[in-house]
């Protein structure tokens, strides 16, 4: 049995031509039990890959095709520690590609399997990584005798891969066009070293055996290695910057205090008595203002605030609202939008500018008791303040708890 352990999708920018679903469908067609996604210097599509793989009943393997100015290797994740190490290594490569893979792996190789096909890379890695986790990669473009020579020299096993960039040989011209665009040149002038040949398509086990007829053990080793990789993926834990508050209860208390202080700015002084029948709700400057004799309107505001805070506290979302409040108050010109505008808590924190009571907006559209994922508040900042605000967030909460989310754009 064969498993593809070196597979690129459209998330390998200007390189891969196959979508995640197309790759998984092909794996099912070829009766593969596992599939590794190894994009070039990134894991942009991996969470979607895991989700889609479950639909196809395929075991998903995390990996990366690590390419620096000097080296080209495949990393595959054995366990959670390996996944974390791989993520940090990828970040290091994005800081600078002027680095050797051996230096990247020196203190972060635990929990990772490494496949390399170049002698100068293996020569360094064999000193760092045990032979149980380091392999010679036999891929298209590498001769069998060369791989066997390296395996003998360094006393390592060989693993065969397809180094996949497209589904079939017919897709290679599309790959070439992508590489040409990437290098801002022409189809006739593109350096051939920058373009994969037709050999780099998604092969069946039989086709791999035809390509490498004297390396059947290497083909079988791919399945053996796949079964050693991590496949039980659960992305449930959230690393959250909680403003140095000791616990969620303290965060909830601080949030309540801020919300009620903001409510008095939004609505006027809130009366603490029982509701009365006479409702006198006046609009002043497009906001609800509570008159001195209107405890009914005051009660409606308090009731809505308490209802929202109860759900927010129960779900453990108080730190989230405090962080958003902290970021928003760095400027006076923010506009909160989306379903977050249905929250009176957001309104009283001046995150949003729309009164949900006035427009009868339902909080459950934003957060409901059954929700398990974190809420999402979209905020627009002035373009000329955006960089300063981002710098503030990184400085306030630290590099280890702050990240920017990439936006993926694809060619049709």
Explain the meaning of each model-derived region.
Residues 165-198, 354-369, 391:
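Flexible glycine/proline-rich, aromatic-decorated loop/lid segments
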Residues 1, 5, 214-337, 411-412:
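Non-catalytic structural connector segments
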Residues 159, 164-167, 331-353, 401-412:
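Conserved phosphate/anionic-ligand binding catalytic regions in large, soluble enzymes, centered on
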Residues 205-208, 366-401:
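A structural-propensity feature for long, helix-poor, extended segments
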Residues 1-34, 40-157, 170-181, 217-220, ...:
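Extended substrate/RNA-proximal surfaces in nucleic-acid metabolism proteins
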Residues 320-348, 359, 363, 389:
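Extended, hydrophobic alpha-helical segments in both membrane/secreted and soluble proteins
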Residues 37-43, 137-142, 166, 241-245, ...:
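Conserved short loop/turn motifs at secondary-structure junctions
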Residues 147-154, 302, 317-333, 389-395, ...:
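Short, hydrophobic/aliphatic alpha-helical segments
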